Amino acid sequence: MRVLGVDPGLTRCGIGVVDGGRGRTVTCVGVGVARTPADQELSARLLGVAEAVDEWLDTHRPEVVAIERVFSQHNVRTVMGTAQVSGIVALAAARRGLPVAFHTPSEVKAAISGSGRADKRQVTTMVTKILGLAEAPKPADAADALALAVCHLWRAPMAGRLAEAEAKAAALARNHKARLKDARQAAAQRAARTGGVQR
């Protein structure tokens, strides 16, 4: 499976593509950062990120897009920009019929380093090691994008099995409810035919 990971941001949007093999084998296909100047109009910045994401999607043709889930921070302006970029990336994926997965920073850190509290340096070190890179991806946004892609590759099979189990459980519950309803209706019809006398 090929995953495009995105660490959304207006000034620096990290983008990384990773291929998953057997087991936990992963290979870096490409990594980069889409940059926009802070003094540019918001619409122009969003367009710049959108064009970069489109190019990555069309060049690398991933099967799924993994985006970091936006959490509220102290700087509302930063959160807004990050959320807007996330929306643009999700839209670009949807236009190509690609599924989009959102992962929290702690999910990514836990998948990559074993600890949801790992710092950026630890995540970068582990991403470099896991992917067998000659040097660490820079800046941290690039490493984070690769970490998102790896996280999705490693979590997706379990998430898929969980979703399948939940769907089966829901189907069993629906069938059980339908059988109960049918049994109650049949009992009511028998009671009506016999004048309410149960035999």
Curated annotation (Swiss-Prot):
Concerning PROSITE patterns, the annotation shows:
RUVC
Subcellular location, in the record's words? Cytoplasm
Q: Which InterPro entries match?
A: RNaseH-like_sf, RNaseH_sf, X-over_junc_endoDNase_Mg_BS, X-over_junc_endoDNase_RuvC
Query: What SUPFAM superfamilies would the database entry show?
Result: Ribonuclease H-like
Names of required cofactors: Mg(2+)
Keywords on record: Cytoplasm, DNA damage, DNA recombination, DNA repair, DNA-binding, Endonuclease, Hydrolase, Magnesium, Metal-binding, Nuclease
What Pfam family does this protein match (any one)? RuvC
Q: Name one GO biological process term.
A: DNA recombination
What does the record give under GO molecular function?
crossover junction DNA endonuclease activity; DNA binding; magnesium ion binding
What's a single GO CC term here?
cytoplasm
Please write the reaction equations for the catalytic activity of this protein. Answer: Endonucleolytic cleavage at a junction such as a reciprocal single-stranded crossover between two homologous DNA duplexes (Holliday junction)
The cofactor note reads: Binds 2 Mg(2+) ion per subunit.
Provide the E.C. number(s) assigned to this enzyme: 3.1.21.10
| Subunit description | Homodimer which binds Holliday junction (HJ) DNA. The HJ becomes 2-fold symmetrical on binding to RuvC with unstacked arms; it has a different conformation from HJ DNA in complex with RuvA. In the full resolvosome a probable DNA-RuvA(4)-RuvB(12)-RuvC(2) complex forms which resolves the HJ.
Tell me the protein family, please. Answer: Belongs to the RuvC family.
Function statement:
The RuvA-RuvB-RuvC complex processes Holliday junction (HJ) DNA during genetic recombination and DNA repair. Endonuclease that resolves HJ intermediates. Cleaves cruciform DNA by making single-stranded nicks across the HJ at symmetrical positions within the homologous arms, yielding a 5'-phosphate and a 3'-hydroxyl group; requires a central core of homology in the junction. The consensus cleavage sequence is 5'-(A/T)TT(C/G)-3'. Cleavage occurs on the 3'-side of the TT dinucleotide at the point of strand exchange.
The name on file for this protein is Crossover junction endodeoxyribonuclease RuvC
Q: Which organism is it from?
A: Saccharopolyspora erythraea (strain ATCC 11635 / DSM 40517 / JCM 4748 / NBRC 13426 / NCIMB 8594 / NRRL 2338)
